[in-house]
């Protein structure tokens, strides 16, 4: 299949608005679980998921945490400006960014841009009983976003504390409602740890401490990766063919322990969510790049959109097994005295893609004509219609707060 020539209209289905879950269930793990096993479709309840997994398998979770990325400023004229944080600029490191005090810069999307003529925006609010004034100054365009410089007048307050006080949690636009206080809890996974996402890795929302304990009791090995989900995850495919769609870039971090566990499991894993898929499959291509040069920079390990389909990396992949690719990354960490790999990926996974590491997938039900639906179709060798027809006919709830599926090709 010529992946680049795929027509997105071939990945459409009718999704009535009433099938989109606007709110989560009261109990996360009581969601429905669609089971696709070797072409057969059935269903169960999510809290029984361990019964459908092979004992001793490796399950990989994305431990990213959604930040309160929406900042609202009211101009003296009354105009409301929304500054939506996309990724840290100065400092560029996520961990440093959230610890920084006094000032920082982000790449942002700006709502009501035409009303922000360049003046400094200000907002005063309370942080731990102290009054703090936050200033925002718009700088240059950076691609399709803007650099915004923030400064605040209390050097004892970190940017993380500031966001917790004044920021608003971004929820998906298709929910068509305002963020509620309850979303601060329900739109985070119970294992979220590393701040940086502007959208949740929603396949993980169904897991509770009880379900995680059941996995442990079933002998499932659990490991975590970090991929900070960008706003591009909601970016619709507007081009007729996907070769004209530009994928967003997302930051990833994988620790030595996870790589060692992957090697123990012969580079085979169950991925929780499409973000874990993109991380694990990107690791393979990073390992391929390292096959002939262990002295690349972490930036040079970035996986470009079409690398798995064409060019030098694609050609080299024919001679690199998934296990060898992961071993190469571990050798790279050893060579450079690192405990974790920090890089980024722009990978697009669509029909024609050959999965390297992911053998089973836990995922929600995705929007029509989305790159996430392409990823699922690639995993099921085109059999996505069967599960979506079943889900629509059997009262499954769709999208971020909806029900789940376990896919075993």
Positions of PLM-derived features:
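Surface-exposed, charge/polar-rich loops and edge strands
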Residues: 1-409
């Amino acid at each position: 299949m010529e992946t680049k020539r795929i027509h997105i209209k071939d990945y459409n289905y009718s999704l009535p608005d009433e099938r989109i879950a606007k709110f989560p269930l009261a109990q996360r793990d009581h969601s429905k679980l669609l089971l696709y096993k070797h072409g057969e479709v059935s269903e169960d309840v999510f809290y029984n998921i361990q019964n459908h997994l092979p004992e001793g398998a490796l399950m990989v979770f994305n431990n990213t945490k959604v930040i309160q990325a929406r900042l609202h400023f009211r101009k003296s004229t009354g105009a409301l400006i929304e500054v939506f944080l996309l990724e840290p600029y100065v400092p560029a490191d996520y961990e440093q960014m959230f610890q920084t005090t006094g000032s920082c810069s982000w790449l942002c999307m700006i709502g009501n841009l035409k009303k922000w003529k360049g003046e400094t925006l200000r907002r005063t609010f309370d942080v731990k009983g102290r009054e703090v004034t936050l200033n925002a100054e718009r700088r240059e365009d950076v691609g399709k976003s803007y650099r915004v410089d923030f400064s605040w007048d209390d050097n004892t307050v970190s940017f993380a504390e500031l966001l917790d006080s004044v920021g608003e949690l971004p929820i998906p636009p298709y929910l068509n409602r305002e963020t509620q206080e309850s979303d601060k809890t329900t739109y985070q996974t119970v294992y979220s740890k590393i701040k940086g996402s502007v959208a949740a890795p929603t396949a993980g929302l169904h897991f509770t401490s009880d379900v995680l304990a059941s996995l442990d009791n079933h002998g499932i090995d659990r490991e975590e990766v970090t991929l900070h989900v960008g706003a591009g995850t909601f970016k619709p495919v507007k081009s007729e063919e996907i070769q004209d769609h530009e994928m967003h870039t997302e930051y990833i971090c994988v620790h030595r322990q996870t790589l060692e566990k992957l090697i123990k499991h012969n580079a085979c894993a169950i991925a929780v969510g499409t973000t874990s898929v993109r991380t694990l499959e990107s690791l393979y291509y990073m390992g391929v790049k390292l096959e002939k040069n262990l002295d690349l920079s972490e930036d040079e390990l970035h996986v470009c959109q079409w690398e798995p389909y064409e060019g030098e990396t694609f050609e080299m992949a024919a001679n690199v097994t998934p296990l060898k690719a992961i071993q190469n990354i571990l050798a790279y960490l050893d060579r450079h005295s690192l405990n974790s790999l920090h890089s980024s990926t722009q990978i697009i996974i669509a029909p024609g893609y050959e999965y390297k590491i992911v053998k089973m997938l836990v995922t929600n039900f995705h929007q029509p004509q989305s790159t996430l639906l392409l990823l699922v179709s690639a995993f099921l060798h085109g059999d996505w219609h069967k599960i979506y027809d079943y889900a629509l006919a059997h009262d499954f709830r769709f999208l971020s707060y909806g029900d789940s599926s376990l896919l075993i090709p």
